[in-house]
Each structure stands twice: as structure tokens, then as C-alpha cells.
């Protein structure tokens, strides 16, 4: 992420053209994050809670996903099976 701070309810949404197994790590990340792995239908299929800042171990999705949402740890209470709805507004 390479940011020193993030505001409440801000995050990063990673979007790919295809669904694949995705890998992340926390190098250069100054705060803990929750990662939401989302399939091509917008359904959360896996949640990795409280990934530790600066941890260089890989976080690997268990299924193929098209989207990953990173949020500051604890900011949103989304669970496996919830839908993600995106708007450009």
C-alpha cells in the first residue's frame, strides 16, 4: 500500500480482468488491514482479518478471485457470502 495513514472507511480495490489465485503481502504497509477476496459475481468468498503491518509473509487466496478489497483492520464488518456493490459516484 505504501501509505503512512488511511482514513476511516477508505481502502483500495484491486480489479483484474480474470479470476485467479491472488497473493498479497504487507511490506511497506504501515497499519493492519482486512482483505476481502471477491469473486466475479461480487460475492465475498474469503476474508483475511487483521493482516499485520510490515509482515512479508504471503497472503494467498484459497479460490480464484477477480477483486480484492483492502480496508483498515476493523473498519467494515463484511463476511463471506456478502455482496460488494461498487459505484462510480
Residue ranges of model-derived segments:
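Compact, glycine-rich, soluble single-domain proteins
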Residues: 1-89
Amino acid at each position: 500500500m505504501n501509505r503512512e495513514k488511511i482514513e476511516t472507511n477508505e481502502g483500495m480495490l484491486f480489479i483484474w480482468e480474470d479470476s485467479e489465485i491472488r497473493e498479497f503481502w504487507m511490506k511497506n504497509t504501515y497499519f493492519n488491514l482486512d482483505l476481502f477476496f471477491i469473486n466475479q459475481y461480487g460475492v465475498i468468498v474469503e476474508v483475511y482479518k487483521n493482516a499485520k503491518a510490515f509482515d512479508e509473509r504471503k497472503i494467498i487466496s484459497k479460490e480464484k478471485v477477480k477483486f480484492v478489497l483492502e480496508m483498515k483492520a476493523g473498519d467494515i464488518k463484511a463476511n463471506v457470502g456478502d455482496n460488494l456493490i461498487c459505484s462510480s459516484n
